[in-house]
Regions:
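Glycine/tryptophan-enriched, flexible segments
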Residues: 26-28, 34-177
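Trp/Phe/Arg-rich N-terminal binding region typifying the photolyase-homology
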Residues: 1-47
Length: 177
């Protein structure tokens, strides 16, 4: 606006736009707890996730004449062979991980998340990172899974999503950190 330039944001990877969360005096939060409790939880609820489209059409690029192999992007060493045991990339894999977490670990999360011998975490980080599932989908799936909206397990997990938001918030407002 200051430079007479209109910018629009189409947020698909965060629960709240970093520019929409401000202190009462208009300043920027620097500490997580007030950011999350007074900023996020007092703000409008995260947008409800949209349904998946019935069909996605892609541009035909087969005529371009180059294959992915021609680009030399794949490694010579098969370093990723063990990933398939732990991570199924894509939306389906993300949905499976979320369902598994809700079924087996969400209730008990607050106590089990710090015990390495227990599968007490969601294991959703790579799926969130690569956009295979949105934090909105996770947020509302957890809200729907808990009968008691005051559950300490639910509050604890949602605050973990809040920490993810806070890191993006800080990078947005303080890009040199």
């Amino acid at each position: 606006r200051e430079r007479d330039c209109l910018v629009s944001s189409f947020n698909g990877s965060l629960l709240w736009e970093p520019m929409s969360i401000r202190k009462q005096d208009g300043g920027v939060y620097r500490v997580f707890t007030p950011y999350y409790r007074k900023g996020c939880l007092q703000a409008s609820a995260p947008r409800y996730p949209s349904s998946a489209p019935e069909r996605i059409t892609y541009a035909d690029v087969s005529h371009q004449g180059h294959s992915i192999e021609d680009a030399g992007l794949l490694p010579d060493i098969n370093w990723d062979s063990e990933f398939a045991k732990h991570w199924k990339p894509g939306e389906e894999g993300a949905a499976d991980k979320l369902s598994e977490f809700i079924k087996h670990a969400a209730k008990g999360y607050q106590d089990q998340r710090n015990i390495p011998s227990v599968r007490g975490t969601s294991r959703l980080s790579p799926h969130l990172h690569f956009g295979e599932i949105s934090p909105n989908q996770v947020w509302y799936a957890l809200l729907n899974a808990f009968d008691d909206q005051g559950s300490s397990d639910l509050d604890c997990f949602l605050s973990e999503l809040g920490w993810r938001e806070f890191s993006y918030y800080l990078l947005f407002h303080f890009p040199t950190i």
